[in-house]
């Protein structure tokens, strides 16, 4: 049975534009995400 193509096609520029720090800082919800991750002690805050 055929599976189809792989759906994850890595692209660093797209990754940064969709999940990056600058994008997170744009909205109130995004800023809260970053602050939550800071409080939790995450090593990486955003993509």
Swiss-Prot record:
Gene3D superfamilies: 1.10.287.3980. Keywords: Ribonucleoprotein, Ribosomal protein. One of its GO terms (biological process) is translation. InterPro entries: Ribosomal_bL34, Ribosomal_bL34_CS. One of its GO terms (molecular function) is structural constituent of ribosome. The keyword Ribosomal protein applies. One of its GO terms (cellular component) is ribosome. The keyword Lyase does not apply. HAMAP family: Ribosomal_bL34. PANTHER family: LARGE RIBOSOMAL SUBUNIT PROTEIN BL34M (PTHR14503:SF4), MITOCHONDRIAL RIBOSOMAL PROTEIN 34 FAMILY MEMBER (PTHR14503). Belongs to the bacterial ribosomal protein bL34 family. This is Large ribosomal subunit protein bL34. The lineage of its organism: Bacteria, Bacillati, Actinomycetota, Actinomycetes, Mycobacteriales.
């Amino acid at each position: 049975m055929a599976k189809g193509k792989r759906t994850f096609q890595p692209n660093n520029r797209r990754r940064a534009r969709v999940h990056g720090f600058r994008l997170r800082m744009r909205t109130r919800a995004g800023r809260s995400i970053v602050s939550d991750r800071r409080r939790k002690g995450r090593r990486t805050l955003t993509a």
